């Protein structure tokens, strides 16, 4: 049993199988008290199952789960003292915002004065002051999700679990709520785990990211660690855009990079484009230019037929004045290679 009081959640060798499908396999995870951790992975990676195991909504086939130092493996959902927010709000449609937030407090028989004070505090915290008498149907999707978060926080849970909380919202609202959630967490400091398949969301919000694939943890680290030092080919290819090339590609023939394994991963922003030949470049031709707003994407074709995607800042693109069919010279600034079939 963990003794460290700074540990909010400890998952030890947890596995879960549904029929013949191994949803979670031998997962170990430590979440520090007060931190915000993202479970990130594609569909079927096991991230939502792991969250439900922590919540007590599923029971592990093997392994132990500790919450704030105590063994909670066999505890009921109620006894775990968690707040849970689903993707689809799950608000009571017939209750006002204020009554939705108060629901858990009233179940616990708090006094009317205490309930009223806590609800008003939370309305201010989630920036919904003045909307307490509205019904969920009178709110936007983003506002409804804030109500769901306020309701989860009302009972002062030791752990807050969020299952793709912004997945049902449009892109602009999602981005606004990501920033808001980070600020909210910095105010309340509740140990929080949230599930997402959105790499940008995880990078922007989380203190630590747990990258999952096929029920296993591929890597745990800060957003910078995950991006700059991916532990496996899956992490490299899942976190951000990447070109995957054979190490025999012409772009590596000019030297300068160590690519000992057959497969090489090259980020689009790590490709340098020049108009004139410079050391360690190889000739290429522009296939296509795509304007992404904040940057420009250039698709370049090497002499061996390999097509690379490169990203350039807008000012660099303007300096180069790139056009389709133009001959250019390219070189990789850095790249990563892994042994074939490499995994942790």
From Swiss-Prot:
Q: Where in the cell is it found?
A: Cell inner membrane
Q: Please tell me which top-level EC class this enzyme sits in.
A: translocase
Q: Which Pfam families does the record match to this protein?
A: ABC_tran, TOBE
The chemistry this enzyme catalyses reads: sulfate(out) + ATP + H2O = sulfate(in) + ADP + phosphate + H(+); thiosulfate(out) + ATP + H2O = thiosulfate(in) + ADP + phosphate + H(+)
The EC code for this enzyme is 7.3.2.3
| Keywords from the named record | ATP-binding, Cell inner membrane, Cell membrane, Membrane, Nucleotide-binding, Stress response, Sulfate transport, Translocase, Transport
Molecular-function GO terms, alphabetical: ABC-type sulfate transporter activity; ABC-type thiosulfate transporter activity; ATP binding; ATP hydrolysis activity
Q: Which residues form a coiled coil?
A: none
* Gene3D superfamilies per the UniProt record, alphabetical: P-loop containing nucleotide triphosphate hydrolases (3.40.50.300)
Q: Which GO terms describe its cellular component?
A: ATP-binding cassette (ABC) transporter complex
Q: Which domain of life is it from?
A: Bacteria
Supply the SUPFAM superfamilies for this chain: MOP-like, P-loop containing nucleoside triphosphate hydrolases
What induces or represses its expression, per the UniProt entry?
A: By sulfur deprivation.
Task: Provide the membrane topology annotation.
Answer: Peripheral membrane protein
The chain positions of domain ABC transporter read: 9-239
Question: Main location per UniProt?
Answer: membrane
The UniProt record gives the binding positions of ATP as 41-48
Assembly and partners are described as: The complex is composed of two ATP-binding proteins (CysA), two transmembrane proteins (CysT and CysW) and a solute-binding protein (CysP).
Summarizing the function annotation, the protein's role is: Part of the ABC transporter complex CysAWTP involved in sulfate/thiosulfate import. Responsible for energy coupling to the transport system.
Q: Which NCBIfam families does the entry link to?
A: 3a0106s01
Which family is this protein grouped under? Answer: Belongs to the ABC transporter superfamily. Sulfate/tungstate importer (TC 3.A.1.6) family.
In Swiss-Prot or TrEMBL terms, this protein is called: Sulfate/thiosulfate import ATP-binding protein CysA
Organism of derivation:
Synechococcus elongatus (strain ATCC 33912 / PCC 7942 / FACHB-805) (Anacystis nidulans R2)
Gene (name only): cysA
């Amino acid at each position: 049993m963990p003794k460290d009081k700074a540990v909010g959640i400890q998952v030890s060798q947890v596995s879960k199988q549904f029929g013949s499908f191994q949803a979670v396999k031998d997962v170990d995870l430590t979440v520090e008290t007060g931190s915000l951790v993202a479970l990130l992975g594609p569909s079927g990676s096991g991230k939502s199952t792991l969250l439900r195991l922590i919540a007590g909504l599923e029971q592990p086939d093997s392994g132990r789960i500790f919450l704030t130092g105590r063994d909670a493996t066999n505890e009921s959902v109620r006894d775990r003292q968690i707040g849970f927010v689903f993707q689809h709000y799950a608000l009571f449609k017939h209750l006002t915002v204020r009554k939705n937030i108060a629901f858990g407090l009233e179940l616990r028989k708090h006094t009317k004065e205490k309930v009223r004070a806590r609800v008003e505090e939370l309305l201010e915290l989630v920036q919904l002051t003045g909307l307490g008498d509205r019904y969920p149907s009178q709110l936007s999707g983003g506002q409804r999700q804030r109500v769901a978060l306020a309701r989860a926080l009302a009972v002062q849970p030791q752990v807050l679990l969020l299952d793709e909380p912004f997945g049902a919202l449009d892109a602009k609202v999602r981005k606004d709520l990501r920033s808001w959630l980070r600020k909210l967490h910095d105010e309340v400091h509740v140990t929080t785990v949230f599930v997402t398949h959105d790499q940008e969301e995880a990078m922007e919000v989380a203190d630590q990211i747990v990258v999952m694939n096929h029920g296993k943890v591929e890597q745990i680290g800060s957003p910078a660690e995950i991006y700059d030092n991916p532990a496996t080919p899956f992490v490299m290819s899942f976190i951000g855009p990447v070109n995957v090339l054979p190490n025999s590609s012409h772009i590596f023939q000019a030297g300068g990079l160590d690519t000992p394994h057959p497969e090489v991963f090259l980020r689009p922003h790590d490709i340098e484009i020049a108009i004139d030949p410079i050391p360690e470049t190889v000739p290429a031709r522009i296939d296509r230019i795509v304007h992404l707003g904040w940057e420009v994407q250039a698709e370049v074709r090497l002499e061996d037929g390999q097509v690379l995607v490169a990203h350039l800042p807008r000012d660099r693109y303007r300096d180069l004045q790139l056009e389709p069919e133009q001959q250019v010279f390219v070189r990789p600034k850095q790249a990563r290679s892994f042994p074939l079939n490499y995994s942790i």
